[in-house]
Amino acid sequence: MMATISDRSTVVVMKDQVSCDLSGEAAILNLKSGVYFGLNTVGASIWKLIQEPKKVSEIRDAILKEYDVEPDRCEADLLALLQELLEKKLIEVKNETGQ
């Protein structure tokens, strides 16, 4: 069962991947599946933040400080990106219940 991501969830990158910076954007390779995944500048900023475990609320606050974006849009886009990274098995999600 896929974990539900909320602002209280903690996310961190999976170990089975490698990534590199490409002129401010990021390219990620899932070592198990062999699939590449690309991130734009904002996505790359988020990727850098989650190299260590971070709460979604901390990531959102960092993005709001760095970029000119409405808080609701920021949260919706952040949750959508994290869900996509989770589905591609590039991140782990831990909720307060230990999931």
Segment roles from a protein language model:
Residues 1-44, 48, 94-99:
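Acidic, low-complexity/disordered tracts enriched in E/D and polar residues
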Residues 35-99:
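Long, charge-rich, low-complexity alpha-helical segments
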